[in-house]
Amino acid sequence: MAEKRPLRTLGPVMYGKLPRLETDSGLEHSLPHSVGNQDPCTYKGSYFSCPMAGTPKAESEQLASWTPYPPLYSTGMAGPPLQADNLLTNCLFYRSPAEGPEKMQDSSPVELLPFSPQAHSYPGPPLAAPKPVYRNPLCYGLSTCLGEGAVKRPLDVDWTLATGPLLPSADPPCSLAPAPSKGQTLDGTFLRGVPAEGSSKDSSGSFSPCQPFLEKYQTIHSTGFLASRYTGPYPRNSKQAMSEGPSSPWTQLAQPLGPPCQDTGPTHYPPPHHPPPHPPQALPCPPACRHPEKQGSYSPALPLQPLGGHKGTGYQAGGLGSPYLRQQAAQAPYIPPLGLDAYPYPSAPLPAPSPGLKLEPPLTPRCPLDFAPQTLSFPYARDDLSLYGASPGLGGTPPSQNNVRAVPQPGAFQRACQPLPASQPCSEPVRPAQEAEEKTWLPSCRKEKLQPRLSEHSGPPIVIRDSPVPCTPPALPPCARECQSLPQKEGARPPSSPPMPVIDNVFSLAPYRDYLDVPAPEATTEPDSATAEPDSAPATSEGQDKGCRGTLPAQEGPSGSKPLRGSLKEEVALDLSVRKPTAEASPVKASRSVEHAKPTAAMDVPDVGNMVSDLPGLKKIDTEAPGLPGVPVTTDAMPRTNFHSSVAFMFRKFKILRPAPLPAAVVPSTPTSAPAPTQPAPTPTSGPIGLRILAQQPLSVTCFSLALPSPPAVAVASPAPAPAPSPAPARAQAPASARDPAPAPAPVAGPAPASTSAPGDSLEQHFTGLHASLCDAISGSVAHSPPEKLREWLETAGPWGQAAWQDCQGVQGLLAKLLSQLQRFDRTHRCPFPHVVRAGAIFVPIHLVKERLFPRLPPASVDHVLQEHRVELRPTTLSEERALRELALPGCTSRMLKLLALRQLPDIYPDLLGLQWRDCVRRQLGDFDTEAGAVSSSEPTVARGEPESLALAQKSPAPKVRKPGRKPPTPGPEKAEAAAGEESCGASPTPATSASPPGPTLKARFRSLLETAWLNGLALPTWGHKSSRPDQPSPCPQLLDSQSHHL
């Protein structure tokens, strides 16, 4: 590479630290691949390779500055034989008009600006010029930008190549291509070509050694840079271009070097002060740009006067060269190529620095330290506006007469320079628009954008970063568009249409939440009211179990309407309560959506503020939920802030309270299923809600990591599961808690319980009633069957004796009803028993089966049935275990709290009944082995246990357990039970006593017992309970019958 170094001194500036020109792929999408894909900034070293467009030509004399290189540059590079002045101006070549059109596609924009970052590499062999390290940014070189005056570098050589076709010193903006994307350190001098010591007017001499480097730089950048930085090589709306290009100082600064986009090859290069033969139309910019009087056409950077007193036309034309080359004093007026500076600088209009201004590194204030800040969509480092007299934010101003308005041009350059009235600074008009655009969406991006701009304005010398890519720009162009609409739309909370869901290039439905939440209140209130009427309790419990999947409104309704619910079941009350929650929910959800989108910076700042303000609401809801006495409150609050599972989360995310039909659909099923359970007292639904919610709470609480609502809720839950406490108080308490915000720890049996308790008890009592009826029917059939037949059944029946016991009178119908009830619990997620919900599946503790439903069965027998069906018991988590114990099963061991899937209970239930039947037969036959003895001893327990299951309905204390000392009388009780069972099934009152005469005394005794039991309605009179049971009339049979009819 050393041999390729230009023979002439480049000056210290040239060898200052030069940032590498590396393409920023982030913005490539915006530019056509043709523009920059060919040669992404490949330059990684200290040399810039300048590919030569064509075979070496006689231009060598023109390239005299680069004595070794001129042959390398083809006419294509130099353009038509450039007049001496033209070639050297700004060290830029323009191709002959003829060549331009053909090569335009190839490298026209690139060739126009030797250093245009976007320029394509030239077909010719690449030249490696030492990478100039610009201690001073290009701006420094510009006398106009710095206003400093003559260059302090050896660049003082007169760079004012009158030839406008090269980079015009007066029109640095046009001359400068947005070449240095990574570093704007390339000084105008460098771009111009390191000041050729030869007079700038000698085009060949003036072609400084930097020119090849500049061209290579341009090539490198143009290929990679244009593609990556420029959204499109083709002119866009000036406004769009402004927003994209001007936004980045790179684009604006670089543009002067050369059009980042490929335009007609010649067009990009400023026309020689003496326009080259190529037709002016070839230039992307109107010919006006070429003419000094139209110098205003040079876009963002007004052509600065040639350094030090290069006033007059040279001032305009040499703007770039002059800024870079202080020698440019003699520069002839150059009209910036129209296509060179397509992007107006966002900075305020650059006042034209006096041509006599000295170019000094001190211009740093004018040089935007951070070019990236301005770049919205392009990584171009705008060549410092200071080169043009002012960097975008620096306040340097190119001559107003040179102001050019960027106009969309067909040329590769996105914008062509359009002459602006001399009075109208191009950068200012452009900047307002651009700023306006930025402001629209900057709220989120403003932080990033503003900082770069500040640095840009800061006075310190331009520090060219390796990647001048704007901090936010790469993603900003889309963001800007989206955000522009978003802030406006979000300003009005109910957007007319959902905002774009893309945030930070990530698709998200979060923005839709606000939109969806707006209509949510009406949609949800209707379904909610409808749901609440049929059975709000089921809806609430179901919704909670589902994690608020669309029934949340319903839940909220019941909970929200707690005060009203007890007295008012009307839709109005529910609607009001629902609307209130929804109103709260929508801000909360909006806040959550904003919260999710916050990192994206695409959200509007106001929204973020709202989010922050709303977050307290969320927090408050969470905190309130645990504190509130009633579980309903918890259900209302929890759904918003927490999710039972990923399913619930997805439901909230994609169906944010919006689905009016969903509540209707979900609730309809709930009400339909609920009516059967609630038949005894359809109206009182709040009571069951409390109970069910409590039952469901364990999971909710566990998942949410929330403390249980309050002692009242626990108290309510505990009475319900415990058969000993009268169910009435529990029911009363549940309604009270549901309706009363204040905790109601003490069970109060009031008129409310009467109305509301039935629904709560209906589900559990109905099921337990069915179960008790089944057990009674089985025991009754066994009791009045002859022992011979029983023994035959035991021998012939299958392992569980299903065939035998299923033939019992009424068993088939009751069993079908009970199984359907179990399936309904699972389907509707309304389990009356303490349970845990996992991933939408309900699990009940095995305690329900072993202790409540089949207390007489040995646990080993139950385990055997589970094994036969391959049913797996799942251990509870610590939180679930704690919740279950607190709510319903305080005395249960961990073994008894193992979880059984509710959906598997219908499969094993018939076999468990078979075990029950076998136990009855063994007891009836008096076959007492150790197990039988335990069973017989537990017989009283069974009798008691089943009533116990009905205890909620009976409101009677558990009967005493009688020791199994009396074996002789056991047959009598069996018969009595059988008779009672038959009677419950519809058999004649006391025919069973004659089934097997144990003895006259016992027979008479049991007959009396059966009669009294029948009169009293007891299904299972037992030997040990004869004294107390007859005295306690219990409507259990009637209740069972009515329930079964309803079923």
Swiss-Prot record:
InterPro entries: DUF5525 (IPR037656). GO terms for cellular component: cytosol. Residues 172-208, 236-283, 448-469, 482-504, 519-567, 668-690, 714-763, 931-1004, 1021-1047 are annotated as: Disordered. Residues 237-254 have a biased composition (Polar residues). Residues 729-741, 751-762, 978-996 have a biased composition (Low complexity). It holds the Pfam family DUF5525. The modification Phosphothreonine is found at residue 397. The modification Phosphoserine is found at residues 208, 299, 391, 455, 496-497, 936, 956, 988, 996. This is Uncharacterized protein C15orf39. It comes from Homo sapiens (Human). The lineage of its organism: Eukaryota, Metazoa, Chordata, Craniata, Vertebrata.
